[in-house]
Amino acid sequence: MSKLPLLPTTVIGSYPRPKWLRESIRLHKAGKISDEDLQEAFNDAVIAVLKDHYNAGVDVPTDGEVRRDEMVEFFAERIKGFKFYGPVRVWGTAYYRKPSVVSKIEYKKPMLVDEFTFAKSVSYTDNLKITITGPYTIAEWSYNEYYKNKKDLVFDLAKAINQEIKNLVEAGAKIIQIDEPALHTRREDVSWGVEAVNEAVKGVNAKLVMHICYGEYSFVAPYLNELKVDQINFAFKIYNYKPLELLKRYGFDKELGAGVIDVHNRRIETSEEVANDIRKILEYFTPEKVWINPDCGLKLLSRKIAYQKLVSMVEGTKVVREELKRKGYSVD
């Protein structure tokens, strides 16, 4: 990793696919363009996403996860043991290809190495983050038709994810984020769910980040310091920063990724609003331990709005950096 400024800015993972990529995917499904043409479109989309992140001033970018339709489906298609029967309605007219576990989970081959290698080759910084869905969330968002209990399923998934993470490190990944948005939804699972995440990152030599967002933080707060990761990033903006008091109460001692952008609202935060929110966060945590990020992935927004939100996030962070510099902090 290269040296980062004080209050590094990053994204959670996903970013809106360019419209032309969505059209290329449609044409490929219709048999009107080749696999090679589709891969070229994916590569071009990664370049476009990284350009947006660069222009916005993001310190730690991702490739926008543009090759992934969905955060669980992508991995279920590539890990042995899953089967898809068809779409399941989530709400309204929204459908999800919910996978089913029908046999023992086994790791087959690298799933993310190629996409990371390409993104690394075109990235403007070696502080590139790669994201992977964690074992608990994959299990929670799937049907279990094979294992006697969910815990056994989750720990087998943790072993598979661990192999993938180690392959990413071998390919040069320095910052790896495990996405576990489901970890804090069932109180009775949290203690062993944390153990499963630790199994997934066992023996990994990289900067490890975990993402949790919408759910009941009080379920997971007592266990956060047990996680073998360097940083945990949270959705704060949507909760009006109330979880900060909870984290302080439980003595949270890791790096804090602070969500300051609402990804479910098309309203674009102003840079001063972001700066005020960061000042609020710094009442609870020292700036050396704080990173700045959106609440969650940006893929559900339009590309224009997502980009403008990142610009506000970065500009607001710069305002606070200058204030800290005047107080004697080294910010570069």
UniProtKB/Swiss-Prot annotation:
Keywords for the protein's UniProt record, in alphabetical order: Amino-acid biosynthesis, Metal-binding, Methionine biosynthesis, Methyltransferase, Transferase, Zinc
Cofactor(s) for this UniProt protein: Zn(2+)
One MF annotation (Gene Ontology) recorded for this entry: 5-methyltetrahydropteroyltriglutamate-homocysteine S-methyltransferase activity
Note describing how the cofactor binds: Binds 1 zinc ion per subunit.
Entries under CDD domains matching the protein: CIMS_C_terminal_like (cd03311)
InterPro entries registered for this protein in UniProt: Met_Synth_C/arc, MetE_arc, UROD/MetE-like_sf
GO term, biological process aspect, one: methylation
Enzyme class: transferase
Keyword Lyase: no
Pathway(s): Amino-acid biosynthesis; L-methionine biosynthesis via de novo pathway
Binding of Zn(2+), residues: H211, C213, C296
The keyword Zinc is assigned to this record: yes
EC number: 2.1.1.-
Membership in a protein family: Belongs to the archaeal MetE family.
Biological role: Catalyzes the transfer of a methyl group to L-homocysteine resulting in methionine formation. The physiological methyl donor is unknown.
Protein name as catalogued: Methionine synthase
Organism: Saccharolobus islandicus (strain L.S.2.15 / Lassen #1) (Sulfolobus islandicus)
